[in-house]
Amino acid sequence: MQRFFEANPDYFRIVNGEGPRPDEARTEFTDLPPAGMPYRKMSLLGFYDDAGTLIAVATIVADFIVEHVWHIGLFIVATALHGSGVAASLYALLERSMIDQGARWLRLGVVQGSTRAERFWQRCGYVQVRERGPVAMGQKSNLLRVMAKPLAGGTIAEYLALVERDRPGSP
């Protein structure tokens, strides 16, 4: 996974202001949500092509803060595959899996100004529910667009009633 991160540094440059750290992959296994943000399970997923090459990585947090809210912490697709439709296909599989496991709402944070990512998540049906920040990330301080997507008949209003921290204007 470290080689994958080093071969695809764009995400890290945009988010952290520098390429992946030498221990970047290891930290994906040890970084946990902050205290006071309960969750049921955290998963690190790798997606491979037919030749066995790692082409994407995702981290998912199940029942994040409240039951049925799942958080996508990371979703990186190999730079060479950008614009090919692979990211949308992989995301569709990931979303289906989360629904099958009980997700009713999905949430994520996108660095404001990361235009490609912002457009991708909007095309996937996510809407901004608030801004958070500035948040220190590596060598940068970023504003985050907190985005959510209701599933299985859920609504954004129901989501915001459950997840107080994502309500506009909350601390």
Question: How does the language model describe each region?
Answer:
Residues 107-111, 122, 127-145:
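Conserved catalytic-core motifs of GNAT/GCN5-like acyltransferases
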Residues 117:
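Helix-turn-helix
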Residues 57, 111-112:
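Short amphipathic helical patch at the helix-1/turn junction of helix-turn-helix
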Residues 3-82, 91-93, 97, 134, ...:
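Acetyl-CoA-dependent GNAT
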Residues 98-109:
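Conserved GNAT acetyl-CoA-binding A-motif
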Residues 71, 102-104, 143:
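Short loop/turn motifs at secondary-structure junctions
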